[in-house]
Amino acid sequence: MKVNKKITAMLLSAVIAAAPAAAPIMDVQTVAAATTTTKTLKNAWSKNHKYYYDKNGKKVTGVKKIGKYTYVFAKNGKLVTNKKYYKYNAKTYYKIAKNGRAKKLSAVETLAAIRLKKCGGNLKKAFNWSSSVRYAGNYKVAKKNVANYAKYGFQTGRGDCYVQAATFYQMAKVAGYDAKYVKGSVNKGKGLAPHAWVEIKSNGKTYVYDPNFQSEFGKKGYTGYKITYGQKGTLLYVKTSKGR
């Protein structure tokens, strides 16, 4: 009997050893992941609307016109949004809305943006720069308008009240303020004289910004920054234009 049991045990061991190993059960999720492929986006926006992919499926960088609108993408491909004056390169600036739609600044707006950037985007520093423009009454511009006055001031650092007001107006507009360039006259004690200044509306009130007044009377303790019409220590302003 013992011999038979030994033989039986040996035969069972041989059968088990010869049997093929059971195949491992692969996780169903692993199989699904292995067989799923990600669709490459081409000429399309990403789901979060932060990136745009070109015809080769690569992220777009730089300036790109998509449909009717222009957009600017950073070096990493991310859409640039909500910038009052975005520096694309040394000579090109864009105003970019919250949805990313971009508008290239004009030549005079670009000059204003460059100067404003040097002022750290600070309105008071921009005003001080305009009031520091050296007085020059004998100058020529192609056409006497706010754009040409401002260009002359930014390019030469010289000019009169029209130029000083024009440079500040352009910087205030680029910075996003509700600004108007105003022409008229003021009384400096010797009758009315032609003059120009800037109005900015803020919280329902209209304030006057007069860089020329600041340059003339600032050292005497007076200010032309954010004053109101009729304020003590200021000029009598008479408007002849509605501003722009």
Predicted features, each with a name:
Residues 122, 157, 192-194:
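Generic hydrophobic secondary-structure packing signal
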Residues 4-13, 17-114, 184-199, 203, ...:
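Extracellular adhesion/carbohydrate-binding repeat motifs centered on closely spaced tryptophans
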Residues 153-157, 187-190:
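A glycine-rich, coil/turn loop motif that links secondary-structure elements
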